């Protein structure tokens, strides 16, 4: 998200996560496995994870975790895919409505923060003026929730610089 050069680090992570592509034990894990396959540019693993999760989401089940797949897990995963493919507007459309429900997926606040960062970056990079305005609102919200965050301050400056020239 921040443009940091990672080299082949995602390939190393994918070596560990790939074998869990079809596990679907925790949606939180699924999203992180997806991030590793997207980062490694492994389209086959990405498609396999999404396809098997979609199939499980269609089947009625009593598993609480999988019951969240249609409303939270799949839109979140798809938002990552859309962002990776340069479809920032679509990523915002998928992620913005569910942002406050993502706590149901588990993980710590810090671990879930990557989802907030994705939404902010997608909105910042959107072609839509309304979504760019949303990015600034999300950054103000983040600044209140995480005061004195250097990353938030950098993003606020970036938004001001990029969008004031548009």
Q: For each predicted feature, which ranges?
A:
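Solenoid-like repeat scaffolds
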Residues: 14-26, 51-68, 96-109, 137-148
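Generic long, charged, amphipathic alpha-helical segments
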Residues: 57-77, 81, 86-122
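Helix-turn-helix repeat elements of alpha-solenoid scaffolds
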Residues: 2-13, 38-56, 86-96, 130-135
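Eukaryotic acidic, Ser/Thr-rich intrinsically disordered low-complexity regions
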Residues: 135-166
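Generic structural hydrophobic/aromatic packing signal, biased to beta-strands
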Residues: 1, 13, 17, 34-36, ...
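Amphipathic helix-loop-helix modules that constitute alpha-helical solenoid scaffolds
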Residues: 1-9, 22-32, 47-77, 81
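"A position-specific structural signal for the A-helix of alpha-solenoid helical repeats
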Residues: 31-32, 36-39, 72-84, 114-125, ...
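Residues that mark the junctions of alpha-helical repeat units in TPR/alpha-solenoid scaffolds
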Residues: 26, 45, 66-67, 71, ...
């Amino acid at each position: 998200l921040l443009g940091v050069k990672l080299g082949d680090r995602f390939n190393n992570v994918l070596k560990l996560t790939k074998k869990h592509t079809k596990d679907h034990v925790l949606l939180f894990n699924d999203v992180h496995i997806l991030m590793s396959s997207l980062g490694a540019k492994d389209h086959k693993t990405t498609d396999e994870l999404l396809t098997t999760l979609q199939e499980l989401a269609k089947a009625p089940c009593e598993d609480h975790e999988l019951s969240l797949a249609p409303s939270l897990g799949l839109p979140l995963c798809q938002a990552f895919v859309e962002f990776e493919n340069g479809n920032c507007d679509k990523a915002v459309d998928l992620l913005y409505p569910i942002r406050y429900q993502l706590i149901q997926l588990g993980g710590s606040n810090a671990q879930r923060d990557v989802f907030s960062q994705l939404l902010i970056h997608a909105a910042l990079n959107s072609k839509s003026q309304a979504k760019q305005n949303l990015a600034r609102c999300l950054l103000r919200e983040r600044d209140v929730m995480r005061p004195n965050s250097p990353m938030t301050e950098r993003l606020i400056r970036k938004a001001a610089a990029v969008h004031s020239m548009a």
